Amino acid sequence: MKHQVSDLHALKDFALDKRVRKMLFKTDQLWSEIACYEPGQSTVMHSHPREEEAIYVLESIATMSIADENVTVPAGSIVNFPANVPHDVRNLGSERCVIMFLKVNPKILKADRDGKGA
């Protein structure tokens, strides 16, 4: 793949029952998705054992718990954190919230750990 241009606004999609995730791209080394939240929707607390993560807020305000710290991230801001850090994403506002996240593909991390390289 040479390159890919994604119109994040055109890819937005919402559902009343749960947040909607859409894959932007997934390569051998990197992946990215957008997640769209109606007011009151959230992603449960979780962690990624090997992957660092960066979350960019495209629209509205995302409230996150990151390693037991509440963080408010407004549109146009990005937050990143190391692997194995518990985190969640919540839309506590009255408007729709859209985030984009970016992570290293866990398969490449496993290959590096196993000595197979990229």
Protein language model regions, located:
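Short strand-connecting beta-turns/loops that link adjacent beta-strands
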Residues: D28-L30, R50, S94-E95
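Conserved short histidine dyad/triad with adjacent acidic residue
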Residues: E33-H48
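Glycine- and acidic-residue-biased ligand/ion/polar-headgroup-sensing regions
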Residues: R50-E52, Y56-A62
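Structural motif
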Residues: I61-T63, N70, P86, R96
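Ligand-binding loop in jelly-roll beta-barrel domains
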Residues: A83-I108
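Histidine-centered metal-chelating micro-motifs
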Residues: S42-V44, T63, V79, A83-D88
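A short, N-terminal "cap"/entry segment at the start of jelly-roll beta-barrel domains
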Residues: M1-W31, V44, K110-A118
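Short acidic-glycine-tyrosine-enriched beta hairpin
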Residues: E69-A83
